[in-house]
UniProtKB/Swiss-Prot annotation:
One of its GO terms (cellular component) is cytosol. GO terms for molecular function: double-stranded DNA binding; recombinase activator activity. The keyword Ribonucleoprotein does not apply. It is found in: Cytoplasm; Nucleus. Residues 77-148 form a coiled coil. InterPro entries: LZ3wCH, Mnd1, Mnd1_HTH. Transmembrane segments: none annotated. Interacts with meu13. It comes from Schizosaccharomyces pombe (strain 972 / ATCC 24843). This is Meiotic coiled-coil protein 7.
């Protein structure tokens, strides 16, 4: 069975780990070489690196004729906190706009019911009501799209990821134990790995440092 390609998120995590583990500065060619060792396709390293730069997770500076890249764990944490803070502010703003529109719609409906006759003013109120309902629907859609960035939702997903990772690591440990047992019994572990599609570098999963 051929190995599955890495997702963009996993490529970003592995590339970010290169900087955090070394706490050093690198040129692009050095990052490409180190990325290849992390099973990231060479041709994609530059794009993955640029996505980290765009998200302000990796810093870059041109010195002379060369661009240097670096990222420290503390910088990455501050960057994520800044993004979460910005998204939370947007979320709060949309909630306030949604609340205001709800109040306006309730007022317009009440006003329309009390007038009792359909005159020009009432027609204007009806059109305004429809416009505000459409605006409210749009805001609620935007609010729903931002909800996954809510710090509470983010923390819940992070906790679930940890649970799944612990379960996966338990299976990894059991696989290593089984391979060791087979080796002690005289079996060819290389054949076992090949038959069961177990990679040589099978190791425990780890969450990136935030």
């Amino acid at each position: 069975m051929p190995p599955k390609g890495l997702s963009l998120a996993e490529k970003r995590r592995r590339l970010e780990a290169i900087f955090h583990d070394s706490k050093d500065f690198f040129q692009l060619k050095e990052v490409e070489k180190l990325g290849s060792k992390k099973q990231i396709v060479l041709q994609t390293v530059k794009d993955v690196l640029q996505s980290l730069v765009d998200d302000n997770i990796v810093k870059t500076e041109k010195i002379g004729t060369s661009n240097y890249y670096w990222s420290f764990p503390s910088d990455a944490k501050r960057s994520r906190e800044s993004v979460l803070g910005s998204l939370q502010a947007q979320l709060d703003d949309l909630k306030q706009k949604s609340k205001t529109l709800d109040e306006n719609i309730s007022f317009e409906k009440s006003k329309r019911d009390n007038e009792g006759t359909e005159n020009d003013a009432n027609q204007y109120t009806l059109e305004l009501l429809h416009a505000k309902e459409s605006e409210l629907k749009l805001l609620k859609t935007q609010l729903s799209n931002l909800n996954h960035c809510n710090p509470e939702t983010f923390e819940l997903k992070n906790e679930n990821t940890k649970k799944y990772m612990e379960a996966a690591n338990l299976w990894t440990d059991q696989i290593h134990t089984l391979i060791a047992f087979c080796r002690d019994m005289g079996a060819d572990t290389n054949q076992i790995r090949e038959y069961c599609s177990i990679p040589e570098d099978l190791d425990d999963l780890q969450l990136p440092i935030l």
